[in-house]
UniProtKB/Swiss-Prot annotation:
It holds the Pfam family SCAMP. One of its GO terms (cellular component) is trans-Golgi network membrane. Residues 1-65 are annotated as: Disordered. This is Secretory carrier-associated membrane protein. Probably involved in membrane trafficking. One of its GO terms (biological process) is protein transport. It comes from Pisum sativum. It is found in: Cell membrane; Cytoplasmic vesicle, Secretory vesicle membrane. Residues 59-98 form a coiled coil.
Length: 289
C-alpha cells in the first residue's frame, strides 16, 4: 500500500530555477529573440507606393481624335481604290497577276479559271505545243553545241542561241498569248493575230525538221538533212540531231492539229464576219485620228 506522501506519477515535474544557476541561464537563453523593428516591411518588398493621377480625360480625347482621323483616312483610301477598280472594269482592263511558273512567276496563266470549259482541252494542247517548242529549241542548242565541240564551227552555235532567245518569248507573245486572250474574251481580232503568227510557227517547225543546207550548211538546226550529214563523221552528234529531228516533227504535227481545231471553233462561232467588222472599225478609228 502506497504511503500518504508518495509522489503522484502524473504530476508535472517541478523545477526550481534558483536551485541550479546554469539551468536558469539556459532557460533564459532559450527565449526567442525580439523582432528588429527596422526589418518590419509592411509593403512586402514592393517599395513605396506611387500616386497615379486619375485625371486622364484629356489624353483619352486626344487618342479618340487620332483614331477618328485614321479611320477617316482609311475610309478615303478605300473609296479611292473602289473608284479605280470601277474605272478599270468599265474600261475592260483585266488586272493579271503573275503566277506561272510557280517557283518563279513571270507570266499570268490560269486556264482552269479563265478559259471556258469547252475550250480548256484545246488551250492546254496549245500550251503543250509552246512547251514543245521550248524543248525543241533547247535540244537544238545542246546538239549544235556538241557539233561545235567536234569542230563544226562557232557560227552554227550562235545561230542556235539566236533561235532560242528569239523563238521562246516570240512564240509566247505572238501566238500563244493572243490565243489565250481570244478564248477568254472571244475577240475576233485576237483570233486573226493568232492565225497569222501560228502559221509562221508551223513553217519554222517544218523548216527545222528538214534543215535544208541554206544557212551554214543547215547544221544550226537539228533536221533530217543535217543529221544525215553529221552522222557520217560523228556518230554521237548524229544521234543527237536525229532526236532533234523527231522533236521538230512531233511539234509540227501537234501544231497542225491545234490550228485545225481553233479554225473549226472560229468558223463555227461566226467569227469571220465579226473579225471583218472589228478590222473595219479599227481602220475607221485610225483614219479619224
Amino acid at each position: 500500500m502506497a504511503g500518504r506522501y508518495d509522489p503522484n506519477p502524473f504530476d508535472e515535474e517541478q523545477v526550481n530555477p534558483f536551485s541550479n544557476p546554469r539551468s536558469a541561464a539556459s532557460a533564459t537563453n532559450s527565449r526567442p529573440a525580439p523582432l528588429n523593428p527596422d526589418r518590419a516591411d509592411y509593403n512586402y518588398g514592393f517599395g513605396p507606393t506611387v500616386d497615379i493621377p486619375l485625371d486622364t480625360s484629356t489624353d483619352g480625347k486626344k487618342k479618340e481624335r487620332d483614331l477618328q482621323a485614321k479611320e477617316a483616312e482609311l475610309r478615303k483610301r478605300e473609296q479611292e481604290v473602289r473608284r479605280k477598280e470601277e474605272a478599270i472594269a468599265r474600261a475592260g482592263i483585266v488586272i493579271e497577276e503573275k503566277n506561272w511558273p510557280p517557283f518563279f512567276p513571270i507570266i499570268h496563266h490560269d486556264i482552269t479559271n479563265e478559259i471556258p470549259i469547252h475550250l480548256r482541252t484545246l488551250q492546254y494542247v496549245a500550251f503543250f505545243s509552246l512547251l514543245g517548242l521550248v524543248l525543241c529549241l533547247t535540244w537544238n542548242v545542246v546538239s549544235v553545241t556538241a557539233a561545235w565541240i567536234k569542230g563544226e564551227g562557232v557560227k552554227i552555235w550562235f545561230l542556235a542561241i539566236i533561235y532560242f532567245i528569239a523563238g521562246v518569248p516570240g512564240a509566247y507573245a505572238l501566238w500563244y498569248r493572243p490565243l489565250y486572250r481570244a478564248f477568254r474574251t472571244d475577240s475576233a481580232i485576237k483570233f486573226g493575230w493568232f492565225f497569222m503568227f501560228y502559221l509562221l510557227h508551223i513553217g519554222f517547225c517544218i523548216l527545222a525538221a528538214v534543215a535544208p543546207p541554206i544557212v551554214f550548211k543547215g547544221k544550226s538546226l537539228t533536221g533530217i538533212l543535217s543529221a544525215i550529214d553529221v552522222v557520217g563523221d560523228y556518230t554521237l552528234v548524229g544521234i543527237f540531231y536525229f532526236i532533234g529531228f523527231g522533236f521538230f516533227c512531233l511539234e509540227t504535227l501537234i501544231s497542225i492539229w491545234v490550228i485545225q481545231q481553233v479554225y473549226m471553233h472560229f468558223r463555227g462561232g461566226g467569227k469571220t464576219a465579226e473579225m471583218k467588222r472589228e478590222a473595219a472599225l479599227g481602220a475607221m478609228g485610225a483614219a479619224l485620228r
